[in-house]
Each structure stands twice: as C-alpha cells, then as structure tokens.
C-alpha cells in the first residue's frame, strides 16, 4: 500500500485535509501551529478514526537555533496530546497514529544544520517511544 500525505507548514483550515477521504497522513508544523490545529479536534477525531495519521513537525527548521532540547519538544507533543484528549480525542488512537518530522523542509539549510535537526528528531522519536 502507498499512503497519501499532505504537508502544510503554516496555518490553514485543517478541515480541508481531514475531510478528503484519500488523505492518509497530515503533516503539520507542530512547533509553530499546534495550538491552531487543536481547534479542529472534531475533524481530527473523524480523521483518526478512519485510520488517518498525524505527523507532528516538531523540530523547527527555519527557526532552528540549536538551543532546542529533546525534553522541551517531547513536552510540547505531550501537551498537544493532552489538549486533544481534553477535546475528546482518544489518547491511545493519537499515539498509535503518531509520526514525527521536521516542521518544514530543509532545502535551504546547510548540511550541518540539517544533520543537527535530524539528530534532534531521532532523539525526540526515541524519547517518545520510551515515555508515551
């Protein structure tokens, strides 16, 4: 099977993506826009129940300073999951359908910065697997 995904590195009307039945993965900038995605909890609930996957773009790219920490980014994901759970989404379903990625593309970044971003992303992924 080939999954179909969409990425939006800004804010949008997320119902556009959640209501398209052929979209399997929604990749969003969780670092910059998680608070706005939470506003679409009902749409996300339906999306996840039909097997949709949320890809949390948690490691910043253009705004990457090098001061970001694994603990801080994992806390942001935990806080996001808690916010969505309070809005009625099933925590287990969120965790079963969770991917992580950089917040946006790395095409304009140098190799050194890109490598640091992917190292941090790996650390976030490993921490989530252990703690959530």
Annotate each language-model stretch with its function.
Residues 8-11, 30:
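Residues that line or immediately flank small-molecule/substrate-binding pockets and catalytic motifs
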Residues 21-131:
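Catalytic-face loop-and-helix region of soluble metabolic enzyme cores
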